[in-house]
UniProtKB/Swiss-Prot annotation:
Gene: tolB
Name of this protein: Tol-Pal system protein TolB
Keywords of the record: Cell cycle, Cell division, Periplasm, Signal
A GO biological process held by the record: cell division
Protein species of origin: Burkholderia orbicola (strain MC0-3)
Region ranges (Disordered): 406-431
Length: 431
């Protein structure tokens, strides 16, 4: 969420933070370009039998690799090449491709698609294996993303995030929509539509649920939405405000910020809505909890030192150990997010009258701004830790942007066809 001169928790200001857009349907297009100084050249031939499919597998694979900023697509021509073909790898190397992909799509008697592909290293003149996937008309895109993930991991040694999903809130006219999309912003589905603000979406570690805060009952209440079934249920409707849900790594618990006794404090609640337990015991404002990936710590924002800073405490609460301050660069830091490997902390820092996304090495304490935008908020790591998604402003609009988490390239604004978009959350690896 956005930031205030006096730190408060996010639910109170949601209605003034989310601005109106003009389009009835908004589409987010995710692009990350120019990552690093070297891009891997790869040629992906058209898969056989895909010309009349509702989704072109090779188009999805090529687009995924290109938007990652890590690959350059070499023209593979228009002739389909199946995975069973004998391939002249030397010829593809001569064309500038260090890797080559061939594949096929075949429909079986049940109407399902069998998608097969093989990846070659043209430099070492060897196969790097492949996958055999089953898909339907509605999951062909997912199959394409999984192929791109396989290629990314085999060639770069890091697990790809193309088959992950995003959640975000779009406001068009007077209506708010919590949308779930593929990692490229395509295939967006509406999880919730409301005339009242929706904020703070947070993915469960399994990727099957999203917790969020809705104002539909004229106050902030925490809900969980089960994506496979479409069922949703209330988790926290305590006296006062209920805000900032964050999942524990085992999915059993949510940390939340509640003003149950006055000042906002951090609590935990079971994912079924029971077992409320207070964790912080300060006279200050404690908010924006976030679990470390090993579940040992909860990072949070507090003004207990006189100005907002990031602290961490044992996941059992301050009764198990005193909270420790984590951020020391800058006088105003909020919105902590820990990378999936537990090594980096992303947060928002007020600098020069604006707000920038910073990344801090949790071992050394070194912190650096990684964006050139100036109204940053709501950072969210990709599941592989390689990228950060965040909300910012560009051209007077609320937009999303993506940036490498090491700051190796400038952020890229994500294209939205109308509307105001914010509150991004990047989902985990699919189980």
């Amino acid at each position: 969420m956005s930031l205030m001169t006096k730190l408060g928790f996010r639910a109170l200001v949601a209605s003034c933070l989310i601005t109106a857009g003009s389009a009835a349907n908004a589409q987010v297009n995710v692009l990350i370009t120019g990552v690093g100084s070297t891009q891997f050249p790869i040629a992906t031939a058209n898969f056989t039998n895909e010309a009349n499919l509702p989704q072109q597998i090779t188009s999805i694979v090529r687009a995924d690799l290109a938007r990652s900023g890590k690959f350059t697509n070499i023209d593979a021509g228009s002739t389909p090449v199946p995975e069973t073909a004998s391939v002249d790898l030397g010829a593809w190397k001569a064309k500038g491709a260090n890797a080559f992909v061939a594949g096929s799509v075949n429909r079986d008697a049940n109407g399902q698609y069998k998608v097969n592909f093989i990846l070659y290293d043209t430099v070492k003149q060897q196969s790097l294996g492949g996958l055999s996937l089953t898909a339907t008309d509605t999951t062909l895109r997912t199959a394409g993303h999984k192929i791109a993930d396989y290629i990314y991991q085999k060639l770069l040694g890091v697990r790809g995030v193309f088959a992950t999903r995003l959640s975000y809130v779009i406001k068009t006219g007077n209506r708010y929509q919590l949308q779930i999309s593929d990692s490229d912003g395509q295939n967006a589905r509406i999880a919730l539509s409301s005339t009242e603000p929706i904020i703070s979406p947070a993915w469960s570690p399994s990727g099957t649920k999203v917790a969020y805060v809705s104002f539909e009952r004229k106050k902030p209440i925490v809900y969980i939405h089960d994506l496979p079934t479409g069922r949703r249920y209330m988790v926290s409707d305590q006296k006062g405000n209920n805000s900032a849900p964050a999942w524990s790594p085992d999915s059993n618990t949510l940390a939340v910020a509640l003003s149950l006794t006055g000042n906002t404090q951090i609590y935990t609640v079971n994912a079924n809505g029971g077992g409320l337990r207070r964790l912080t015991q300060s006279s200050s404002i404690d908010t924006e909890p976030f679990y470390s990936p090993d579940g040992r710590w909860i990072y949070f924002t507090s003004d207990r030192g006189g100005a907002p800073q990031i602290y961490r405490m044992p996941a059992q609460g301050e009764s198990a150990g005193a909270a420790q301050r984590v951020t020391f660069t800058g006088s105003y830091n909020t919105s902590p997010r820990v990378s999936p490997d537990g090594k980096l902390l992303a947060y928002i820092s007020r600098t020069g009258g604006g707000f920038k996304l910073y990344v801090q090495d949790l071992q050394t304490g070194a912190a650096n701004a990684i964006t050139n935008t100036n109204r940053d908020e709501s950072p969210s790591f990709a599941a592989n830790g390689q990228y950060l998604l965040y909300a910012t402003q560009s051209g007077g609009r609320n937009v999303l942007a993506a940036v490498p988490s090491d700051g190796s390239a400038p952020p890229q604004i994500l294209s939205v066809q109308g509307g105001s978009v914010r509150e991004p959350s990047w989902g985990p690896f699919m189980q």
